[in-house]
């Protein structure tokens, strides 16, 4: 997290505030997302729900596929790279995407190091499930944070847990009385004292913080906005439903009018069959289940 480059990159991410970012796997889906009012799309070859089932190593998408989506819409396009895989990031940056997501949804390439994002011109998005994780990613140069949630499940509870935890930890740290106490917490979080102080003074992260992971309905999106998120990522929920066009528009409307119950009632009606999903509690380590939110450090 350094100087003017970071200000520019975090400023670009600020432009997405209040919006919805949708996962898409084809140019046709990207066009649906754009028409529905999405502020950006995430181009990837498989949505998280399908990645969960495959059991395969998940890598960055084919650059040609990403380029085809970039050529199909006028809104910003994001693409995912594996945690720690700075060469995938170099390739995606050369493709001139608008944002890169260093994502726990893909199979990590490095189990001890995240990408040094300050070395790139393109803004990075990273997931976090608590304040320390968010600040470590920001210190590496992330211009945007999202809750990890539990991607591909349609179960919003992990995303709710993560945004509540970050908010509560900021409030708790604001109660610290001495410089020594603040320094101790910063050391425990493995971040500079100056970064933690900046958060405590502002009462929020220095970058936008979107909700992600398990968002499947307009009500889910509005819930996370009311809990303090700056916007919403929607992955598997849209195109695993029976009426993606209607649902995509409804989620955008709910994100915009998140504090208007009458509008939320209107956009939540007659949506067709929603994503079936998988409950968080059914993903057990005993049965070799993998919780994607636990990937990262």
Curated annotation (Swiss-Prot):
Pathway: Cofactor biosynthesis; pyridoxal 5'-phosphate biosynthesis. GO terms for molecular function: amine-lyase activity; pyridoxal 5'-phosphate synthase (glutamine hydrolysing) activity. The keyword Protein biosynthesis does not apply. The active site is at residue 80. D-glyceraldehyde 3-phosphate binds at residue 164. Its EC number is 4.3.3.6. The gene is SNZ1. One of its GO terms (cellular component) is glutaminase complex. InterPro entries: Aldolase_TIM, PdxS/SNZ, PdxS/SNZ_N, RibuloseP-bd_barrel. Belongs to the PdxS/SNZ family. Catalyzes the formation of pyridoxal 5'-phosphate from ribose 5-phosphate (RBP), glyceraldehyde 3-phosphate (G3P) and ammonia. The ammonia is provided by a SNO isoform. Can also use ribulose 5-phosphate and dihydroxyacetone phosphate as substrates, resulting from enzyme-catalyzed isomerization of RBP and G3P, respectively. One of its GO terms (biological process) is vitamin B6 biosynthetic process. This is Pyridoxal 5'-phosphate synthase subunit SNZ1.
């Amino acid at each position: 997290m350094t100087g003017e480059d970071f200000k520019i990159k975090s400023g670009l991410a600020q432009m997405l505030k209040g919006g919805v970012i949708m996962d898409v796997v084809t140019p046709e889906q990207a066009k649906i997302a754009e028409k529905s009012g999405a502020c950006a799309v995430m181009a990837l070859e498989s949505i998280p729900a399908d990645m969960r089932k495959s059991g395969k190593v998940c890598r960055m998408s084919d650059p040609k596929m990403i380029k085809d989506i970039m050529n199909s819409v006028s809104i910003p396009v994001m693409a995912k790279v594996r945690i720690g895989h700075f060469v995938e990031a170099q390739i995606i940056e050369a493709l001139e995407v608008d944002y890169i997501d260093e994502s726990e949804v893909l199979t990590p390439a490095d189990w001890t190091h995240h990408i040094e994002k300050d070395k790139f011109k393109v803004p990075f998005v990273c997931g976090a499930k608590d304040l320390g994780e968010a600040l470590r990613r920001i210190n590496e140069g992330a211009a945007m944070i999202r809750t990890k949630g539990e991607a591909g499940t349609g179960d919003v509870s992990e995303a709710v847990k993560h945004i509540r935890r970050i908010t509560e930890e900021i409030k708790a740290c604001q109660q610290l009385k001495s410089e020594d106490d603040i320094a101790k917490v910063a050391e425990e979080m493995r971040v500079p004292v100056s970064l933690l102080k900046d958060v405590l003074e502002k009462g929020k992260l220095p970058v936008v913080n979107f909700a992600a992971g398990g968002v499947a309905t307009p009500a889910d999106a509005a819930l996370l906005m009311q809990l303090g998120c700056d916007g919403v990522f929607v992955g598997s929920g849209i195109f695993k439903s029976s009426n993606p066009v209607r649902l995509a528009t409804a989620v955008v409307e709910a994100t915009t009018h998140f504090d208007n119950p009458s509008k939320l009632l209107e956009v939540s009606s007659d949506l067709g069959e929603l994503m079936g999903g998988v409950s968080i509690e059914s993903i057990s380590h005993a049965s070799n289940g993998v919780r994607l939110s636990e990937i990262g450090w």
